[in-house]
Amino acid sequence: TREAVTERFDRVVVATGHFHTPHLPSWPGVETFPGQVQHAHDYRSPEPYTGRRVLVVGSSYSGQDLALQLHRAGAAHVTTAYRARPQDIAWPAGMDEAPEVQGFDGAEVTFADGSTAEYDAVLLC
């Protein structure tokens, strides 16, 4: 038998899975990166990143959330890379922002402003 149920809510979340299929960008030299490159789609917990330097590519809400979670769980340093504009967030010590990724040379990542930094892992959001 079917029973109709009516309920009222203050808020409703519609999670349709629009971003279910990960977008995996390709940068020059990414194949030389010795660490792990993983999409947030496959991320399960921050523990594997404890003590590591992590680059989070994508600085919108999911990227910011992931970056803060990694920081709180003990990542050595977390950088969020943005494409359009910086988020202008007062990040805690051990976190920062960088412009768009331009390429990799081993563990060293080059950003759009010419700056470079070394990372142990890259998470794509």
Outline where the language-model segments fall.
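Core Rossmann-like FAD-binding/catalytic domain of the broad FAD-dependent monooxygenase superfamily
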Residues: T1-E3, T16-G17
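Core beta-strand elements of the Rossmann-like FAD/NAD(P) dinucleotide-binding domain
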Residues: R2-R11, T50, A112-A121
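A Rossmann-like FAD-binding core segment of flavoenzymes
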Residues: L68-C125
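Glycine-rich dinucleotide-binding loop and its adjacent helix/turn
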Residues: V14-A73, V78-T80, A90-E97
